[in-house]
Amino acid sequence: MDINKQKTKWDISIFKNENFTLPVIKSPFNTYYNKYIDSVINDIEEWHRECCFLGREKLKGYIESKPYLFSAYYYCHLNEKVLPFIIKFVDMFSIYDDEYLEKTNCSEDVINQFLDKNYKDKNIYGVEWFKIVEGLKKYGNKQSVNKFLKEFEFFIKNVHSIHLKENANYTNINFEEYTNTRSIDFGFDLVVSAAIIDCEEPSKEIRESSLFLTLNTKSSIICVLVNDIYSFVKESKQPDTMNYVKIMANKKKSIQKALNHTNKIINNTLKEIISIENQIKMQYKENNLYQYIERLNSVISATIYLHQNHKRYSVHNKNYINKNN
C-alpha cells in the first residue's frame, strides 16, 4: 500500500521495515507518592473482593497489577480521609471504562445509573458510585466536590461518543481540535478536579483569567501527547488514527520522525507551562492558586512517570525505550 494513499486509516504494515525507539520524557516537576496509600490499600483490596467487578478469575491478576499506583502518584497530596474514596473511584471507573464505555454497544442505561441516584436498574457499579459520592461529600471540600461531580457528568456523557468515533479520520483535523478531543477522552479536567478535591479552588477571577485557562490547556496537551507516545506500540495494531503519533507518522512517512516531533512539542510545552506559572504567580498572590499549581504539576509528573513505569504500558514498550535519550 502506498503511504501517500493512506488518508483515513492507519496500517502499521506500511512501516514494517522501520525500527524506532520511544523517547524518555523528563518531567521538570517532582514526582510524589501519597504517604497514606500503604495504610489504606488492604481495605481497598478487600473492597474489590467484595464487589468483584471483574469476576473471581480476573480479580487476582487485577490486584497483582497494583492499580492503586495511579492514585498514589496522581493524587499524591490528598489527605487520608478522602483518598480511599478517590482510589475506589479510579479503580472502579477504569474497569467500567474498559468493560462498558469503550464498547460500541454501550447503552444510555449504562451511563444513566451514574447520574440518577434513584435509577431503578443500577448494577454494582452504580451502587458503589453513590457510596463513593457520599464519602467525597463527607470528607472533601464542598466546592471542589461539586466541581468534580460536574466534571464526571461531562466526562461520562461525552467519552462514549468519542469511543464510537475512534474509527473516524483524525488525520486532517488541526492540532487544537485533536488535543481538545483527546483531553476529554483522557479525562484531564476530571483528573485535576479529583486532585484538588480536599482543598479550595483558586478564586473565580483567577479561574477565568487567560493565564489560568492557558495553563490548563497546555497541561492537558502534555497528558494527551505523553499518553499517545507510550500507548503507541499497543495501539499500533489498531486501524484508527486517534493517536497523534499515528497522525504524524502518516504525514511524515516515518514513525521515528513522528515520535521525535511529538516529543519536541512536549518539551516546548513544558517550558511554556513553567513560564505561565511564573507569570500567574506574580500576578496573583493567593495560597489556593499555589496549591492548585502544585497539584497540577503533580498530575503532569504522574502522567509521565506512570506511562514510563507502570506495567499497563511497560509490558508493551520494554523493547522500544531509548535509554540513552
Swiss-Prot record:
Source organism of the structure: Dictyostelium purpureum (Slime mold)
Pfam families from the UniProt entry: Terpene_syn_C_2 (PF19086)
Origin: domain of life: Eukaryota
UniProt name for this protein: Terpene synthase 11
Domain notes: Contains several highly conserved motifs that are important for catalytic activity including the aspartate-rich 'DDxx(x)D/E' motif and the 'NDxxSxxxD/E' motif, both of which are involved in complexing metal ions to coordinate the binding of the isoprenyl diphosphate substrate in the active site.
Family statement drawn from the similarity comment of this UniProt entry: Belongs to the terpene synthase family.
Record EC number: 4.2.3.-, 4.2.3.46, 4.2.3.47
SUPFAM superfamilies, per database record: Terpenoid synthases
Role played: Terpene synthase that converts its substrate farnesyl diphosphate (FPP) into the sesquiterpenes (E)-beta-farnesene and (E,E)-alpha-farnesene. TPS11 also converts geranylgeranyl diphosphate (GGPP) into the diterpene (S)-nephthenol.
Motif NDxxSxxxD/E motif in this chain: 227-235
Motif DDxx(x)D/E motif in this chain: 97-102
Enzyme class: lyase
The keyword Cell division is assigned to this record: no
Signal peptide: none
GO MF terms held by the record: lyase activity; metal ion binding
UniProt keyword list: Lyase, Metal-binding
InterPro entries per UniProt: Isoprenoid_synthase_dom_sf
Reaction(s) catalysed by this chain's protein: (2E,6E)-farnesyl diphosphate = (E)-beta-farnesene + diphosphate; (2E,6E)-farnesyl diphosphate = (3E,6E)-alpha-farnesene + diphosphate; geranylgeranyl diphosphate + H2O = (S)-(+)-nephthenol + diphosphate
